Amino acid sequence: NREMAIHIANSARYFLPHIFALSTNSPFWEGRTTGYKSFRTKVFDKFPRTGIPDYFDSIEAYDNYIKLLVKTNCIDNAKKIWWDLRVHPFFNTVEFRICDVPMTVQETITIAALFQAICAKLYKLRSQNLNFMMYSRALLNENKWRAGRYGIDGSMIDFGKEMEVNTRVLIYELLDFVDDVLPELGSRHAINN
């Protein structure tokens, strides 16, 4: 349902920089190296309604935000929300939009399987009346910037530990976090590749 979708979207925001770091592959702009692993996001983030979304405490709050933008002629429909992740405007799903285009079919399958596993794990936690820690958009953007600049070769902030951690280590921790839902999803092989 849409209420579950907004809850999963809120929680999944934390993992966006992790998966983004795995997908970075746009280091050039106008034929020149930029020093970023993904410069595409630096360009795209200049547009409105992009980047990591705010936290919404309910689907009603999310819908009211969309209605206000439509009513005030900012957008003509919810498809004009270009966040890195959003509740799809026509389906009861969470849509992830942060990644650079993967270079291979296998990379595409792996990233899709990771997003699926994150959603399944967050759904499982919610079904057990548990929640994943919520962090502010400002903090999440720190990790997004690091992921865009350094990809998996840098470090990001582990907000729970309040320290910098190698991005690869955080990705391994993400894999451990979703491990128990992989058998049911049948996606272990896709992720292990």
Residue ranges: model-predicted function:
Residues I6-E60:
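Metal-dependent DNA replication initiation modules
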Residues T41-N193:
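C-terminal accessory/tail domains of diverse enzymes
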Residues N1-F20, M103-C119:
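Helical (often loop-to-helix) elements that flank the catalytic cores of nucleotide-handling enzymes
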